[in-house]
Regions:
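Flexible coil/loop and intrinsically disordered segments
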Residues: 1-502
């Protein structure tokens, strides 16, 4: 039966005496553990010194008790240990602070915290910063004696006056509910942090070594990049395919990335789990190599995710495809290579909110096309030709929006994407892609839907500055200007592809 314990304990009892006090019956032999699903230790020296200064202020203000936060623990049945669900950053920082004050037997710092550049750097850096403030002075004078006396009083205050609220549960799901609630009231974590924790809990049938490898792979990617990837790309694609406006990914809508759990038994769930298992089985075998066939794609952007390990594979799969799409290097990647349109966009149209929105529309539509129609391996010439034609259509669709605004913001962009705008070429590209069974049917539909722009339609100030009307007012004199083979005006590609009319 699941149990829940609420208590208050001092830092000294918890970290030095391994005891949680101030509850019906003190809990002894509390072995704190930082589980694999935890984020790296990311507090910087500034955070650590700020905590120290707050404690000193509380002590100097004669506060009898100083509440320093909440610690959420999951008591595991298998190892009789207490996994830190929330509060890791403070616990490690307090451990470093007490070590700098002379304690050398703090269990949290003795356990293996998996190898990570953040852990290695921040733990060492923060300890050094704290030691410079509170460590024993080498000089033998009155000032050093006074400093030592003050630090002994500070150490006593930290151990016996600084308190934590402790929540202990034997139900890991309940622990994470408290965790979500805490972060909803305080500084929220990135949604992908919550998803990481959720899917790691679904991996109880995976070995510890494999779990550690998955976590390391995840943490190798910049957390800011992951936040951008989920919030601006995966989330928006899912909403737009469904015909919804895409606002902000947060804790209230991350359910769309939780997916089908291992315990789900409905026909709907079994269908998607079976499809994943089949793809995994084929790709893990020698069949693709021996037969020369293509790998089977285990994922689709507009279908449910399988919870657990597949979620991390899904993330890596689409993150790599997106980086490939965004990298126009001639000799790297499979999809966009040395594309003349993308060269112009990369060189001249990356700065500014409007250009950023438009490029995101271009990238996400290409990502959805690749996901639906491009083979992962062994593309044919027909595959490549169809893809390159789609890139032109995706560019015309996205940059028709940019050309029709002097200042473009998200409200106008969302209306354009939904097909609610009065601007030329407003329609939901994502729904259109998702409805097509073949790339040829998609390209035919786009050929019917896309219309050319006229001089009167073009409002983009930067684009207008790049050309001058000739004497008869019918042609653009310097639309063809280029440097090092890169055209300066994206409207040139409207003209050469028949989507600009005088």
């Amino acid at each position: 039966m699941n149990s829940l314990t609420l208590s208050i304990t001092t830092i000294g009892d918890l970290l030095l005496r391994k005891t949680i006090t101030n509850c019906e019956e003190p809990i002894k032999d509390v072995e704190l553990c930082v589980p694999l699903y935890q984020r790296p230790y990311k507090w910087t020296a500034r955070n650590a010194i700020q905590l120290l200064d707050d404690i000193i202020d509380a002590k100097n203000s004669n506060k009898e008790r100083y509440r320093v936060g909440t610690l959420i623990l999951h008591k595991t049945k298998e190892k009789e240990q207490y996994d830190i669900v929330d509060g890791q950053q403070r616990i490690i920082t307090f451990s470093l602070l007490l070590t700098a004050l002379g304690e050398n037997s703090i269990g949290v710092l003795k356990q293996k915290i998996y190898d990570n550049t953040y852990n290695d750097h921040n733990i060492a850096n923060n300890y050094n910063a704290l030691f410079r403030r509170v460590g024993l002075k080498s000089e033998d004078n009155d000032s050093a004696v006074e400093h030592q006396r003050e630090m002994e009083h500070l150490k006593d205050y930290i151990e016996n006056r600084c308190e934590l609220i402790v929540v202990i549960t034997t139900d890991v799901s309940e622990a994470f509910q408290f965790f979500d609630s805490q972060n909803a009231r305080g500084k929220a974590l990135y949604p992908h942090d919550l998803l990481k924790a959720y899917h790691l809990r679904e991996m109880n049938n995976i070995s510890e070594d494999e779990t550690e490898r998955i976590v390391k792979d995840w943490e190798q990617v910049s957390q800011r990049d992951l936040a951008d990837f989920f919030g601006n790309y995966l989330y928006r694609i899912k909403e737009w395919v469904a015909g919804n406006k895409a606002n902000i990914l947060n804790e209230h809508n991350i359910h769309m990335f939780k997916g089908v759990t291992r315990l789900a038994r409905t026909p709907y769930a079994q269908f998607y789990k079976s499809a994943y298992c089949y793809a995994d089985m084929v790709n893990s075998s020698a069949m693709p190599f021996v037969s020369g066939t293509r790998n089977v794609n285990a994922f689709q952007l507009d279908t449910p995710i399988i919870a657990g390990k597949p979620f991390f594979e899904y993330t890596k799969h689409y993150y790599n495809i997106l980086k490939d799409i965004q990298n126009n290097n001639k000799y790297e990647g499979f999809y966009i290579n040395d594309n003349i349109i993308v060269k112009t966009l990369d060189r001249h149209f990356k700065k500014g909110i409007g250009n950023g929105i438009t490029r995101l529309m271009f990238d996400t539509s290409v990502l959805l096309y690749v996901d639906r129609f491009c083979p992962e391996t062994y593309p044919t010439k027909e595959d490549i030709d169809l893809f390159e034609q789609f890139v032109i259509y995706a560019f015309i669709w996205a940059y028709s929006l940019r050309a029709q605004y002097t200042n473009l913001g998200w409200l106008s962009a969302q209306n354009y994407i939904m097909g609610w705008s009065e601007k030329i070429n407003t329609f939901n590209m994502y729904k259109l892609i998702a409805k097509q069974d073949t790339p040829t049917s998609l390209l035919s539909a786009l050929a019917d839907k896309l219309n050319p722009l006229s001089n009167d339609d073009i409002k983009d100030g930067w684009a207008q500055e790049c050309y001058e009307y000739s004497g008869d007012g019918e042609t653009l004199k310097n639309l063809k200007d280029e440097k090092d083979g890169v055209y300066e005006n994206y409207l040139y590609f409207f003209q050469t592809n028949g989507y600009y009319k005088n």
